């Protein structure tokens, strides 16, 4: 394993991080002939380290596991780890280094959509493969990216439908609270269109954005309470990302907001983010994901055991983006074996239809739009920082790359197989 850029121990709310050691310089290190190199492109410092450092460790766990089993195509797999430091332009620089200088076969990385958007032109220019493990806003399908997290129809829309229903409390007013960047803004655009189609009036929708790392939540939480005082059942849909979630939830507690009064459903808060928060006043608030550590099945039992043994800390938790990396890495390995090579074009073709029995308890399938079919789960926060699953789909849901709720997306197709061979078109590229 090579690691470039010194890492710092991010404050993962009291969780212990796997220390990373600086070795060689990326600009002078020649390609290693005896290994298959993959890139790990996650922030190990800055505002997103709280979420992304664990994803780096997840890939290292998967690499360790495959090497113990004899490697891939007769070679060891080598992880080349870099730290883009929550700096969006730096993501692109590090991606270019991984592809052009380190000659990695694939990259596993990014969390925020702004980081993914930053690296996308690099992957398309250099024909690299990115496995992106986090829920996002949709509205994209690149032949150089496999999206292993949730699209809006696999998280955001089902969560709002749940809260609108009797089981979820029958919410009538909505606060869409997000960090100010592309994922929250686009997701909320989709949710606003969905809510209005359900005859929710504009006066019953409040939208607010705050910067990354925001901490002064007193005024905004007071505004949420005032908005909810109109008399209709109110719910908060949170697309807040990174370490801003800590003071947000603390201020909810300080303001005496209980889930029975104003439920909050979060799309970027999971077990890792709750690890350092006193959750006794957050019991009953919700998160929507495709996996929770608390689900019971043999595959998840093995996943949790493998993680705790690798990280050498029984208190460390698993979460949804970790499961997405688990699925993505296994699918990449299967595709490489099927293709008999790490060649990007050959592996891409072999990815379609790959199946992995996932820790969620379901079998995930890679579709020709480069998105997974995944189950949807809604969990309630427990006192121990875990989640009780209160609702889930019966079967995996196929991701929509383009939203049926946006008029401008009407007729758009993402299908990278013949005759379409495109990620954003209204007619097939090839016709007989």
What is the role of each PLM region?
Residues 98-111, 131-133, 173-178, 231-242, ...:
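Periplasmic-binding protein-like
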């Amino acid at each position: 394993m090579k690691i470039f850029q010194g890492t710092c121990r991010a404050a993962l709310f009291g969780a212990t991080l796997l220390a990373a050691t600086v070795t060689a310089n990326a600009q002078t290190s020649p390609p290693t002939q005896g290994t298959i190199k993959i890139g790990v492109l996650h922030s190990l410092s800055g505002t997103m380290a709280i979420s992304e450092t664990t994803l780096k460790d997840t890939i290292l766990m998967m690499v360790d596991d495959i090497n113990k089993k004899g490697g891939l195509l007769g070679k060891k797999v080598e992880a080349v780890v870099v730290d883009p430091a929550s700096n969006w332009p730096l993501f692109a620089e590090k991606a270019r280094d991984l592809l052009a200088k380190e000659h990695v076969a694939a990259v596993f990385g990014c969390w925020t959509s702004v980081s993914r958007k930053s690296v996308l032109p690099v992957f398309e220019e250099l024909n690299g493969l990115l496995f992106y493990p986090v829920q996002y806003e949709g509205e994209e399908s690149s032949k150089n990216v496999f999206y292993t997290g949730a699209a809006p129809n696999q998280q955001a829309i089902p969560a709002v439908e749940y809260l609108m229903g009797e089981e979820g409390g029958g919410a009538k007013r909505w606060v869409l609270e997000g960090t100010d960047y592309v994922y929250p803004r686009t997701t909320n655009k989709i949710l606003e269109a969905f809510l209005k189609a359900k005859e929710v009036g504009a006066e019953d929708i409040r939208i607010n954005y705050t910067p990354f790392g925001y901490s002064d939540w007193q005024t905004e939480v007071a505004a949420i309470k005032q908005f909810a005082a109109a008399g209709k059942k109110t719910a908060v849909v949170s697309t807040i990302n990174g370490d801003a979630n800590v003071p947000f939830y603390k201020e909810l507690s300080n303001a005496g907001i209980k889930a029975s009064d104003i439920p909050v459903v979060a799309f970027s808060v999971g077990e890792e983010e709750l690890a350092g928060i006193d959750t006794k006043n957050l019991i009953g608030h919700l998160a929507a994901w495709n996996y929770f550590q608390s689900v019971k099945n043999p595959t998840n039992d093995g996943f949790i055991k493998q993680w705790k043994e690798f990280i050498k800390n029984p208190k460390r938790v698993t979460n949804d983006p970790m499961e997405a990396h688990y699925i993505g890495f296994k699918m990449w390995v299967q595709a490489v074996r099927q293709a008999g090579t790490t060649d990007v074009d050959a592996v891409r073709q072999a990815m379609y239809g790959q199946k992995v029995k996932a820790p969620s308890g379901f079998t995930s399938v890679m579709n020709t739009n480069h998105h997974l079919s995944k189950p949807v789960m809604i969990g309630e926060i427990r006192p121990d920082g875990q989640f009780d699953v209160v609702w889930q789909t019966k079967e995996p849901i196929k991701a929509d790359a383009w939203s049926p709720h946006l008029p401008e997306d009407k007729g758009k197709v993402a299908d990278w197989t013949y005759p379409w061979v495109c990620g954003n078109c209204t007619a097939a590229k090839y016709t007989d």
